[in-house]
């Protein structure tokens, strides 16, 4: 038996130098967050680093002083040679590129801001929301609106994820909330070579706890980019979606406990280097059908990455509005994923809650054990979705 790690990255949206650097910074953030999210033998990981970084990018636009520097360092912009004044233009270029992207796959990314109706935003922050992010502005009453305010936000998320995520928030929000910065992303891709449903059969999947489970497993003769790396103890296959601009890249460790070891040691540079070495060939692929649904409160995990000041009483978001001491109370993130014979469907939504401070030879590639995954655009290299499956 071999432990599997599947890295899926769903997108890369960069044409200019700053965008290339933003992609590098976002991919570093993706791997860092993967390292810091807790797992167990019976739980899985799935998140959209792209969704999280865009939502917090809006917070960066309104942050000032040490709070802005905290986000700047936490997202690794200096390590990627991005100047402070280049960050927002890089996001603006990403947004324009994303909306103009033509593909055989469906990729919808939406940005929004739910704002308390009595809050007067600075014109400079409104300009950033409109011009850099193309955000939808949702006016709500967080103080008296109760469930009505939640319904507005959940309705927006439901529409933008095509019904895959119904509830970002389950009930009425605190009355001290003044705005919620939102991102929603939806992906649907058809395999370049669709798996024949008639060949799907029950096969054992070795869970991380070493308990096998019979799961529906697809089988197909597929042309993929593939290579084995014996010295690293990993087998990699990149399964393309129709149009070849998106792919699911699967890293399959040779050891049954290899997923955790691989997760601890993978870097964005290593992933990129390994993918570059893959060679196209026909492979007999065995891939389980599976669904994932996850929800995270990211405050503690972001703090581990050095992003602290946005949450404290000393947070400085004076670039958003005058006359209110604002701080982030938490970052809510939800994702869903379904992998089946026809392809993949995934969605993610993020809400940054800001409150008024008081808080060739045919090869067999058998995916039959725990794995980590990214979905990515093969041209742009941005990581949009990351996950780790330990239990089916």
UniProtKB/Swiss-Prot annotation:
Localization (cell): Secreted
Signal sequence annotation: 1-16
Expression (tissue specificity): Female salivary gland.
Domain of life: Eukaryota
Keyword Cell inner membrane listed: no
Any GO MF annotation of the entry: serine-type endopeptidase inhibitor activity
Pfam families membership: Serpin
Positions bearing carbohydrate: 104, 130, 265
CDD domains, A to Z: serpinJ_IRS-2-like (cd19577)
Keyword list, A-Z: Glycoprotein, Protease inhibitor, Secreted, Serine protease inhibitor, Signal
Entry's Gene Ontology cellular component terms: extracellular space
Record field: transmembrane: none
Family designation: Belongs to the serpin family.
Protein name (database record): Iripin-4
Organism: Ixodes ricinus
């Amino acid at each position: 038996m071999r432990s599997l790690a599947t890295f899926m990255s769903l997108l890369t949206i960069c044409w200019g130098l700053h965008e290339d650097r933003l992609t590098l910074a976002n991919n570093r953030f993706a791997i860092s967050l993967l390292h810091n999210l807790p797992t167990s033998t019976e739980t899985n990981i799935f998140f959209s680093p792209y969704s999280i970084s865009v939502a917090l990018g809006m917070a960066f636009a309104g942050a000032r002083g040490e709070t802005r520097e905290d986000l700047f360092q936490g997202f690794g912009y200096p390590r990627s040679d991005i100047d402070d004044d280049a960050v927002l233009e890089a996001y603006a270029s990403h947004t324009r590129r994303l909306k103009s992207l033509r593909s055989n796959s469906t990729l919808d990314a939406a940005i929004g801001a739910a704002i308390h109706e009595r809050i007067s935003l600075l014109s400079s922050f409104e300009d950033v929301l409109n011009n850099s992010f193309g955000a939808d502005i949702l006016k709500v009453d967080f103080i008296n609106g109760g469930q009505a305010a939640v319904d507005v936000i959940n309705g927006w998320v439901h529409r933008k994820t095509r019904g895959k995520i119904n509830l970002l928030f389950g009930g009425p929000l605190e009355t001290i909330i003044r705005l919620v910065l939102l991102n929603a992303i939806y992906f649907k891709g058809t395999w370049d070579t669709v798996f024949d449903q008639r060949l799907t059969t029950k096969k054992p999947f070795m869970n991380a706890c070493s308990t096998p489970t019979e799961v529906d497993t697809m089988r197909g003769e597929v042309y993929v980019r593939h290579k084995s790396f014996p010295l690293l103890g990993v087998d990699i296959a990149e399964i393309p979606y129709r149009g070849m601009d998106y792919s699911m890249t699967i890293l399959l460790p040779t050891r049954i406990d290899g997923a955790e070891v691989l997760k601890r040691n993978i870097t964005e540079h290593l992933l990129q280097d390994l993918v570059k070495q893959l060679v196209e060939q026909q492979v007999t692929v065995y891939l389980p059908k599976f669904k994932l649904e996850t929800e995270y409160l990211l405050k503690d995990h972001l703090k581990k990455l050095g992003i602290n000041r946005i949450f404290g009483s000393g947070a400085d978001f004076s670039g958003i509005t005058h006359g209110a001491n604002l701080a982030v109370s938490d970052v809510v993130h939800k994702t869903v994923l379904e992998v089946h014979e026809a392809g993949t469907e995934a969605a993610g939504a993020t809400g940054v809650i800001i409150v008024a401070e008081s808080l060739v030879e045919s090869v067999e590639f058998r995916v039959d054990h725990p794995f980590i995954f990214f979905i990515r655009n093969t041209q742009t290299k941005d990581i949009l979705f990351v996950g780790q499956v330990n239990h089916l």
